[in-house]
Each structure stands twice: as C-alpha cells, then as structure tokens.
Amino acid sequence: MNPNRTLLFALALSSAPLASVQSPATESTAAAPQVLPGKGLAQHDFLYAGESKNRRAFIIRKGQIVWSYDDPAGRGEISDAVLLSNGNLLIAHQYAVKLISPEKKVLWNLDAPKGTEIHTAMPIGTEHVLYVQNGDPALVKVVNIKTGKTKKEFPVPVGNPKGVHGQFRHGRLTSRGTLLLAHMDMKKVCEFDVTGKEVRSWAAGNPWGVTPLKNGNILIVDRPSIREVTLAGETVSTITPSTDSPDFKMTSLQMAWRLPNGNTLVNNWFNEWGGKLDRTNPPVQAVVFTPDKNIVWVLRSWENPDLGPATTMQILDEPGAPEQVSFGDIK
C-alpha cells in the first residue's frame, strides 16, 4: 500500500472515535433539551422576581406581562416578594423592604440600618409586616406600617454574627402562628413562636428557602435538593434535580412551592455576579415536578420577554390572600 495512503487511512481511523466523543459532549453541556415541557409563559398566571443587578418584578397572566415594576435607583437584590389580595406588592431587596401599589406608588418603605440586610418579609393582614434583619444581632421584627411602631422584636441565633450576608434569605409564617426560618450559616431550619422561643428545628445542608405545607409538613430547599419533612423530622420525599432530571442543569436552587394539584414548583437562580449569561444556551428559570418526579412545565424566558434570574414566584391561577396569616396574637 502507498505509504501516504496508509497514513491517511490511519488518521481517518484515529479521528473517528474523537468525533463520536465530541458530539455527545456538546449535548451534555446543554442547559436543557431543545423542546421544553408545558406551555411556556401561558402555563400559569404568576408573580416573578429574582436576585439580580436590576430590581424588577413581573406579573404574568395568560402568557403576557400585565404589570411590571422596575427600581433602577434602588440598591440590592429582590430576594422576596408577596402579592397581596388587594394588588399591593411587598418586596424585600437587601437594603430595604417596601410596599408598592398597583399604580407603582411606594406606600411604605423601611431602610435596613447600616451594617444590616433584609432579604425576607411577610405581610400580616394589611397593617403589619414581619421581616428578618440580618446583622449583629440578627432580629425578627414586626412593624405596624400604619403607625411605624415596632409591634414585636426578638433576636435569633446565627452562625457568624459578622457574616451578615450569609445569615438568612427566607422565612415564612405557618398556620400554627409560628415562624419558619432557614438558617443558612447554621445549617438548619428553625421554628419560632411569637415570644422568640425555638419550638423545633430540622438539620439541613445549606438551607435557602422554606415553605409550610397545608398538610403540616414543610419544604426545605437544601440547594442540591428539595425535601418534604414532617414536624417530627421524618423525610417524606426528596427531589434531587441533578439525578432526577439530569437533562436540566439546575445548579442553584433557592425556593420551592407545593401547587394545589400536588406538583412542586422549584426555581433555578442564575448568579449575575458570578458570570455572564450565555444567551445561546441559557439555564431554565423554574420547573414543576410531579410527585413521581416527572417534569411537566419548564420556564425559560430570557428574551421577548426577558424576565431575568428567578428567585421567588407566586402562582396566581386561583384567588388567594397570603396576608391572611398570624404570628401569635398578631393578625
């Protein structure tokens, strides 16, 4: 055989395995399959906001943005948002917590004192707001937004009093009139009564979000997974996207919510401070898992419209009044 032809034949053989390896590698870097389950923006009506360099919030109905809020002059990032039944929006954006009317008028604002941060806030009726103030010490506060007076205040433990940013991101009130707090730097979730007494706690790896369920259990977002646990600490179910849905690259879980049909909505945050978004291969912003861990809806909207990173969502398919909660005798 001609030596040159032999060399060409050998090169062809050696390149064949390389080509077969490169193609799957390209597929493995995809953030999600090309065809996504569900109806996109039209799947649900919902409130959407996220930790981003832009403080924006959106209300989506029937697949369209019907209301949006932009706070270009503000500081921080929106970590929490709650849409009240009267249309007002409560947001916590690190350096302040504020209540905004449907006409985008700021009805009430409270700035975080120097050296502190506010990442989570909850309405109690129409007159009170509970918020958690990261700091040294870290505090749970309930303020009357009509009078400006503090109704309740107590300190809560933290792992690192000086590491203000890493203390808390999320808390929620339960039907028992208690407060659930995800202690990120203590690797646990705690339940407090209105006096500040710890009622119970659950060990967690890196808890970001916590959601009380109607059955009395709670959802803990442990960053790599979402666990439903009982009050006694028994794990009822676990969703681990990296193994349960490996085709979807979900690397930064923050919050999860149980939908009325039993499915679980999970957000997937993109860190704008950690890198530039690849708009040719953007990550999903949220997914819905069935109880048997099938994905039935995926939200990925980075253009037309660009919703930005996802942190918090509130499904609006049915009328609700999230302000109808209590903290002890505060209603």
Region roles according to the model:
Residues 1-8:
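Bacterial N-terminal signal peptides that target proteins for export
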Residues 8-17:
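Bacterial N-terminal signal peptides
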Residues 17-19, 128:
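Hydrophobic alpha-helical elements and their junctions with loops/disorder across both membrane
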Residues 26-331:
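Histidine-/acidic-rich catalytic cores in large beta-rich domains
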Residues 19-21, 25:
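Boundary at the C-terminal end of the N-terminal hydrophobic targeting segment
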